[in-house]
Amino acid sequence: GCLVFVDGEFWGLYLMGRVNTAETFARRAGGSPEEIQVIENRYPSQIAPEYGELYRLVTEGNTSGHGTYQKILEQMDLESYLDYYCANLYFGNSQFDSFSTTLWRRAGEGETGKWHWEFSDATDTLGRNKVSNYSVNTYLCPGVAEDLFLQGLLKNKDFQTAFRQRMREYVEELTKEKAEEYLTPLLETYRVAVTATAERYGLR
């Protein structure tokens, strides 16, 4: 976040969002940006051709079979997908659905890497608190229940096991106590700025 002043006048606290680019992923994975391919997966009718092969394999293939599932794993980074999906579910990201994500892979000369999933927008994290909590099945939320890619993967027992295990890790590790331990020191840092912003825009 940052505090914005215009000609000395306080304009409030603003959140700075990161833009996912080839440079971003090149710094993380190593190599040059020219070797990184990035796509924005936005609408079912606009599946990028580069991603279409994997998408069709998962949504139209016999994913319950070992052979098909192994072909899928050759094209996707399973750990990345599990973290992406389980985190969005656990944090209740209300802007989350399968067509609001960024995918990237290394695709340099003579090399085609696995697809990785990346958060595109988490500014409304915990925004589902009124419709998705301990008493509501998050899986029934439209962005998840209508996801053909996830449905295809869930036909495979190995994926089911991996998905349950990763979600269990989130539940066991990201507890209320650990969250409070991390967030409480930040509260005092942001309290004044948040209060001033709310007062400026009449949000109190």
Predicted regions mapped to residue ranges:
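Middle-to-C-terminal accessory/interaction subdomains
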Residues: 2-5, 10, 14, 42-204
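Conserved structural core of kinase catalytic domains
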Residues: 6-7, 11-45
